[in-house]
Swiss-Prot record:
Belongs to the DEFL family. Keywords: Antimicrobial, Disulfide bond, Fungicide, Plant defense, Secreted, Signal. This is Putative defensin-like protein 52. Residues 1-20 form the signal peptide. It is found in: Secreted. InterPro entries: Defensin-like_dom (IPR056373). It comes from Arabidopsis thaliana (Mouse-ear cress). Disulfide bonds join 31-55, 41-64. It holds the Pfam family Defensin. GO terms for biological process: defense response to fungus; killing of cells of another organism. GO terms for cellular component: extracellular region.
């Protein structure tokens, strides 16, 4: 009986982080060269709890993207120029 109670206590004290996500997290603002660039992406993504941030311009869009090392969440924001 004591062994059973120890097992129940060990299981109930475990720390599980469960997150239900309906889609990828949204960045705070649109990433656009000359307006919202690397510094702003880093600031907003890190403020939201992500590990890193980047701003990658493209021919018709720019993306603010980050991936956390622990949960592999991706945060993208696209801006049409």
């Amino acid at each position: 009986m004591t062994f059973f109670l120890v097992i129940i206590l060990a299981i109930s004290s475990s720390n599980y982080n469960v997150l239900a996500v309906s889609g990828p997290p949204k960045c705070i603002a649109l990433c656009r060269p000359g307006y919202y660039e690397r510094f702003e992406c880093f600031h907003d993504c890190i403020t939201e709890g992500y590990d890193d941030g980047s701003c990658v311009p493209g021919p018709t869009t720019a993306k603010c993207g980050i991936i956390t090392k622990t949960t592999n969440k991706i945060c993208y924001s696209f801006a049409f120029e």
